[in-house]
Amino acid sequence: MQIDDALLSKLEKLSSLKINDDKREEIKRQLSEIVSFVDVLNELDLKGSEAVVSSIKGGTLLREDSPIASDVIDIILKNAPSQEGHFFSVPKIIE
């Protein structure tokens, strides 16, 4: 699948994002690479293969969890087209 301007515009509208004109070609190229990779994965013959949740024997490796101060919410929200408090504000699409 090739990502063209029409599809990119549709994705912009659905995601409520605005892609700058100087980044459009780069984004189209990156999205095309992602779709091509998924197409390659779809070609794999997995008949008879059992689903694997984790390849690590003995469970998941754990790390120590320690709280740290972060301003990640403010960084993310400054890119939002609309926000209410510390949340994204999106248009209602379902009645």
Curated annotation (Swiss-Prot):
InterPro entries in the cross-refs: Asp/Glu-ADT_sf_sub_c, GatC
NCBIfam families with a match to the protein in the record: gatC
Species whose genome carries this gene: Campylobacter curvus (strain 525.92)
The family this protein is said to belong to: Belongs to the GatC family.
Enzyme Commission no: 6.3.5.-
Gene: gatC
One BP annotation, GO: regulation of translational fidelity
GO molecular function: asparaginyl-tRNA synthase (glutamine-hydrolyzing) activity; ATP binding; glutaminyl-tRNA synthase (glutamine-hydrolyzing) activity
Protein name: Aspartyl/glutamyl-tRNA(Asn/Gln) amidotransferase subunit C
The protein's role, per its UniProt record: Allows the formation of correctly charged Asn-tRNA(Asn) or Gln-tRNA(Gln) through the transamidation of misacylated Asp-tRNA(Asn) or Glu-tRNA(Gln) in organisms which lack either or both of asparaginyl-tRNA or glutaminyl-tRNA synthetases. The reaction takes place in the presence of glutamine and ATP through an activated phospho-Asp-tRNA(Asn) or phospho-Glu-tRNA(Gln).
SUPFAM superfamilies in alphabetical order: Glu-tRNAGln amidotransferase C subunit
Keywords: ATP-binding, Ligase, Nucleotide-binding, Protein biosynthesis
